[in-house]
Regions:
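Hydrophobic beta-strand positions that form the internal "hydrophobic ladder"
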Residues: 30-31, 74-75, 118, 159-161, ...
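Residue-level marker for isolated small/hydroxyl-bearing positions within beta-strands
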Residues: 34, 77, 121, 163, ...
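Structural motif
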Residues: 37-42, 82-88, 124-129, 168-176, ...
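Loop/turn-rich, solvent-exposed surfaces of beta-rich toroidal or solenoidal domains
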Residues: 167-173, 187-225
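Blade-level signature of beta-propeller repeat domains, shared across WD40, Kelch, NHL, RCC1
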Residues: 241-279
Length: 279
């Protein structure tokens, strides 16, 4: 989509697109996605794509995929009835190696910025961290008495930011921060029942979509003040699909909603409230 004109163009003919696997390359010139069992790499200029890898027989694809920061490799899970394995795929030659094999379905691997480590999920139960060489595979000690919502690396790669959803429905959903190198976990702020979470370029401001049916809002939360500011209503039938994100310079927020009858992308300017960050 051209953000100035709103004009869209089709990038792929994928028949079994896994939207959770769609990821831009670090140079912004291409993208990867899973089309059924096939991992494909596309070029944004030529609109051509090629198959890089296919999931072998006896395995199925786990949810999610991502690129390493240097754009050399991609990360994804292959799942069998007995186990799952985290795969590191060299994009140039299409050769895959197994980072680690685990006895549960792994998903949504994310490379750690500036470090040879991978964050991945065990459903909504737990977050795990492992080195690229398969060593030090460990479960992170996140908050208890609840499940894990959105989780991602802070832009500097030092901490993991995530939503903690308490088992007790009378308690508020909270943004928490885990520091793997110190094995510490702390609450950043409670929220107006965020369904999903994003942050700006330096993680000083968060954006979320409320799951509260009576207050279906897009909000930003200032980290230092721990204060929320309402931006607009998303009125989406599925608040978990809203997925608000900041632009690279932190001056705009984009989100999706079906509030006008069909799924569309919306933009809100926040330059009056949020300082510009390096794009």
């Amino acid at each position: 989509m051209d953000l100035k004109t709103g004009e869209c163009r089709q990038l792929t003919q994928a028949h079994e697109l896994d939207t959770a696997s769609l990821s831009l390359l670090p140079d912004d010139r291409g993208f990867i996605l899973f089309d059924g069992p096939a991992l494909r790499q596309g070029n944004l200029s030529t609109l051509r794509d090629r198959e890089v890898y296919s999931i072998p027989e006896g395995w199925t694809r786990g949810p999610g995929a991502s690129m390493t920061g240097d754009g050399v490799s991609s990360l994804f899970f292959e799942v069998s009835p007995q186990a799952s394995r985290l795969r590191l795929l060299g994009m140039a030659k299409g050769s895959a190696t197994t980072v680690v094999e685990i006895p549960f379905p792994g998903s949504h691997p994310i490379a750690r910025p500036r470090r040879a480590q991978v964050l991945y999920r065990q459903g909504d139960e737990a977050l795990w961290l492992v080195n690229f060489d398969g060593r030090q595979n460990r479960k992170l000690k996140t908050a208890s008495d609840g499940t894990i919502g959105t989780a991602f690396w802070a832009p500097n790669g030092r901490t993991v930011l995530y939503l903690h959803i308490p088992t007790d429905v009378t308690k508020l959903v909270a943004i928490r921060e885990h520091t793997p190198d110190e094995n510490s976990d702390k609450q950043v702020a409670t929220t107006s029942q965020f369904a999903s979470l994003g942050c700006n370029g330096d993680a000083s401001v968060f954006v979320g979509a409320s799951r509260n049916r009576n207050s279906p809002h897009i909000l930003i939360l200032l980290r230092v003040a721990r204060r929320e500011l309402m931006l607009c209503e998303h009125r989406c039938s599925d608040p978990f699909a809203v997925s608000p994100i900041f632009s690279p310079d932190s001056q705009r927020i984009y989100f999706q909603s079906d509030r006008d009858g069909k799924r569309a992308i919306y933009m809100v300017r926040v330059d009056k409230f949020v300082e510009e960050t390096e794009a």
